[in-house]
Amino acid sequence: MLALLQLAWLGWLLTFPVALDSDDALNFAHGVTRFSVLEFSPHFPGYPAFIWLTRLINLAVDDPARAVQWASLLGSSLLAPLAALLAVKLWQRPSLLAPVWLLVLALPLTPTLALSGLSDGPALAAWLGSLLALQQRRIALAGLLLGLLLALRPSYFVLALLPLWLGLAQDGTRVRFVLPIALVGLTSLLFVWQADGWAYFSEGRRFTDGHFTLWGNTAAAHGDRLLSWARTFDDQLTPLWPLLIGALLVLPLWQRSKNHPAALPPLWTLYWLVLLLWTLFGQNPDNPRHLAPITLLGIVLLAGWLPRRGEWVVAVAGLLLLGVTFTLPRPPAMVQAAKLAEKACPALVTQWGVRLLRETTALPVTDGWYKGDAALALSQGACRLSRRPIAASEMSTVVRQHWFAPRFAAEPGLWLAIPSLQTPHGESDKKHRKSAKNRQDN
């Protein structure tokens, strides 16, 4: 029954239109046809295994955008069964299969990852698979999946810490564990080397510095981003998230007090805490998908608290939440906003999807990061696209704001502010926009 539900879920997501809604997804699509980190095809660190997967799919579909989205969908469709199997193995309770499976499937994060066109879903599947293989003592498979995790999404190196520790702790099997990791790593290094050579490492240093100091929006560089994380936790995990975090932190004490037969070492809780700190200080709170690792592992660990009589209650709740997540297929907010902007705007100022909008629309697009250029474009009648409501002080005239709702709660929505000026001679908005466009072109 769970397998049939999983197939229905997969079929539902396949009905959504293929659409790239971020610069990162566009970069991956470019990488399908030409790989170069220096050309942002894709951006650093290159994600070699994800490029291999998308190129393999592209042999069948001959459409880079579709190949990228299907690769994300394929990996994300494995998250629910792998998380459920890991919970069953860790807690030695087969009855946890249905509640964990349904709960992960019902998370707004799961379809968001599936349709993102990014490497998060496949990398998380490799991560859960490596942890599960270690519990089953399939050491070589665990090493292979861990190597693929790092090749799919090298920025997930923090996720590799626990499986690496557990694998190296296995006496007599370390070579079988390390060899696949080394082979995948060497193959990945040769792949990026043949494209960019030594310049790859220079780009890596530049990109990493920029992520943590300038445009990455991380709390490591901007302490106020921790408040943004609090809002993101509220939106994605309900305001009860402090209780959930507290429960995870006291998990080792609970196991000891109950003499749980399948008690986990405190290392698992410590590992989850490390992932939490890495998320808070190294990731962007504007992208809720960065909560996926701690959310998935948190569900697996908290499953042990679930009383046996409550398992089917959680399963039914998961089904109900899955019904709430269901929505009719439609393009993402970025695509909808771009279509309206092309009809109503002479130009556009935004900090989101700048490269995507420049390549997929005919509009002049100004990067909002450059304040002077943005102010000049806005003074000439450009529209403003933002993930936050646009204050009147940000615009040089009265505007009409349009809200584009996300398809899922973990996707970003967008605001588009369109100037509604009248010229002194009573000309229409359309004529004024045409005049503003002519001035900008000149």
Question: Which residues are covered by each model-predicted region?
Answer:
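Membrane-lumen/periplasm interface segments of multi-pass, membrane-embedded glycan/lipid transferases
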Residues: 196-254, 277-280
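Short acidic/glycine- and proline-prone juxtamembrane loop motifs at membrane-interface regions
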Residues: 44, 112-122, 287-288
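Transmembrane-helix motifs of polytopic, lipid-linked glycan transferases
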Residues: 70-92, 125, 129, 249-255
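Transmembrane alpha-helix segments characteristic
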Residues: 5, 104, 179-183, 257-281
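Hydrophobic/aromatic-rich transmembrane helices and adjacent perimembrane loops
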Residues: 120, 152, 158, 244, ...
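Specific aromatic-rich, kink-prone transmembrane helix
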Residues: 33, 82, 103, 122-146, ...
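Membrane-embedded, lumen/periplasm-facing catalytic core of multi-pass transferases
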Residues: 314-382
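Perimembrane helix-loop-helix junctions
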Residues: 158-185, 254-257
